[in-house]
Design a protein with these regions (language model features):
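Active-site rim loops that border cofactor/substrate pockets in soluble metabolic enzymes
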Residues: 15-55
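Conserved active-site and cofactor/substrate-binding residues in soluble primary-metabolism enzymes
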Residues: 10-18, 44-51, 68-72, 93-97, ...
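Short, small-residue-biased leader/transition segments that mark boundaries at the very start
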Residues: 1-4
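Active-site-proximal loop->helix
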Residues: 12-17, 76-81, 99-106
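Flexible, glycine/charged-enriched surface loops at secondary-structure junctions
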Residues: 26-37, 60-67, 115, 140-146
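Terminal helix/beta-alpha structural elements that buttress the NAD(P)+-binding lobe
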Residues: 7
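Hydrophobic alpha-helical bundle architecture
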Residues: 51-71, 75-90, 110-116
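Internal helix-turn-beta structural module
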Residues: 96-143
Length: 146
């Protein structure tokens, strides 16, 4: 119990120190310099997700973001191409502290709040099931006519 708590506290302090150091190092990057922010602190995975969002929007395809990390990517995409948000949907309201404000900044609303914070796209999986059901019901009611 005590050993685990001490290790958890130490890991949290290390993470906080790393975040502080990164913010200090890159404090001069303007907030609207999406490429500068992404290239400094985003990493390969975040860059790929931003590309998926922009590519989907360019092809009139929907992207479901799932959790805070993908919300951060969507914020970068929005800075680059604000119209891309017309093709982004939030799967759920993550339990992470900044989730609500990030969705508000994106102009998105979460359809469900399940307290998820798993990092396994579980919210997106639930949202896909809900969308599939909604389309199925719509087609049943309209006789298959769009």
């Amino acid at each position: 119990g005590d050993v685990y708590k001490r290790q958890s506290d130490e890991r949290l302090k290390l993470k906080q120190r790393i975040v502080h150091d990164v913010l200090e190092k890159y404090k001069n990057i303007p907030k609207d310099d999406a490429i500068g922010i992404l290239s400094s602190v985003g990493g390969f995975e975040f860059t790929c997700i931003v590309g998926v969002i922009l590519g989907a929007a360019a092809n009139n395809a929907l992207v479901i973001i799932d959790g805070f990390n993908t919300s951060a990517c969507a914020l970068v995409a929005k800075t680059l191409v604000p119209q891309a948000m017309d093709y982004v949907m939030a799967s759920h309201l993550s339990a992470e502290k900044a989730a609500k404000s990030s969705l508000e900044n994106l102009g998105l609303e979460a359809y469900v709040d399940l307290g998820l914070c798993l990092g396994e796209a579980s919210g997106g999986s639930i949202q896909m099931g809900m969308l599939d059901l909604a389309v199925h019901m719509y087609l049943a009611v309209t006789g298959g006519k769009a």
